[in-house]
Amino acid sequence: LYDRQKTGKGMYIDVSMLDCQIAILENAIARYLSKNEIPKPMGSRHPSIAPFEAFKTKDSYIIIAAGNDKLFEKLCNVLKISEVNQNPKFSNNSSRAKNMDELKKILEDKLSTKITDEWVKEMEKDKIPCGPIFNIKEAVENPQIESRNMIVKAFHKVVGDFKLAGNPIKMSTYKDEKTRGDIPDL
């Protein structure tokens, strides 16, 4: 838009899903390009920040992103395991990252005592970044998904009415309709 205002010409914007996926691999790409190290699969775990991954609770899973020492201290206080923060194996991020398997067991032992929603509420009070991991039903029915218009209605002459994922790109002057036009035959 700035370029159009400056030059009077518009432009084509190309955003590919592949490019977006590669962009999110910034840490792995940096490690490969700087150290020629090919990262191994780690699940949801961050390679150098701990704890920063999914943990099992009593009923499901929670993502916790205690990305610095202050957040880890708050997390230990919420979980009522402040002594863990005093242990040299876990007292700073570098030590926690080296001992993450042991730390994960300690955290999951405590997290298994309550359901995810209870932990999320407690952690959010202390501004600890966290959130539930939704199954597809929970994700689709989440009020935030509805408010972002990410499930929309469409029509196809053979299939009839159906729903599909909405457009993740939101633009202030483009009306993001809750209903898409008729789907063409291919």
Where are these regions (language model features)?
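Conserved PLP cofactor-binding pocket of PLP-dependent enzymes
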Residues: 124-145
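Short, surface-exposed loop/helix-turn segments at secondary-structure junctions
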Residues: 32-39, 142-156
